Amino acid sequence: MRYRGIFLNDEDWGLTPWASQTFEPERGNIGPRTYAKVCELLLRLKANYLAPAMHPVSTSFNQIPETKLVADTFAIVMGSTHCEPLLLNTASEWDTKTMGPWNYDKNKEGINRVLTQRVRENSPYENVYTLALRGLHDGAMSTTLPMHEKVRMLQQALLDQRRILAENIDRPVETVPQAFTPYKEVLEIYSNGLELPDDITIVWPDDNYGYMKRLSGVREQRRTGRSGVYYHVSYLGVPHSYLWFSTTPPSLMYEELRKAYDTTAD
């Protein structure tokens, strides 16, 4: 398996208080020392990928220059979760006062300008670039467009993000690691005709409770980008959160992840 790692989510009640009160009190938040421990843990677990914390309560990973150096020192490949295009933490980094609305129909140029800057800043490091277009902080994009227009808008956004990568990374865009996670409403858009370049890895999500919502079909199994898995072992959201107890049986994890692995999630 080429990339295996974790997404630090819902850090509000665990990692942020611990880091700010006991481990990095001088910073008062998650910082380079905390990420060094996370990266060390990943290596001990034979993992090599990290999507950093992204709630507004914590300082964005890319707002602290040292954190990128920490990840690079540990040879950890950095990425971002399903709603963060091209390593941009929209939940805490997007400022509507200075950047305009987070709306692709109304502010396409402004959004792509910020994404371009992020790719330029992070291109010296090893990354998996998420291609995405959702609302701010894990919500659907605010729009009343019919489904065929949602497909069109997302299709254009992904093409623009590919163009940004091609123009700012000195290698063929087909060789730049890219991932697309059809999570929540995006899965419906994908199922209604969204087309992806063959080299993009499709990261299939579970239903937030440990059951895979979709696996690669015959056509998708032939894609050079193969597929991956976005799998929850805790969840904050509707209809029911579970954060404190390990309620997903290991046997279920094995069964679901094995099905995904057998259909090119490798």
Residue ranges of model-derived segments:
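An acidic-aromatic substrate-binding cleft motif
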Residues: 1-27, 33-53, 225-228
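Short helix/loop capping segments that flank catalytic or ligand/cofactor-binding pockets
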Residues: 15-18, 61, 88-89, 140-141, ...
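Glycine- and acidic
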Residues: 15-25, 47-53, 97-101, 136-148, ...
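Short, glycine/acidic-rich beta->alpha junctions
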Residues: 30-34, 58-63, 182-186, 247-253
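Glycine-rich, aromatic-flanked loop segments that form ligand/cofactor-binding clefts
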Residues: 1-15, 72-90, 201-205, 209-210, ...
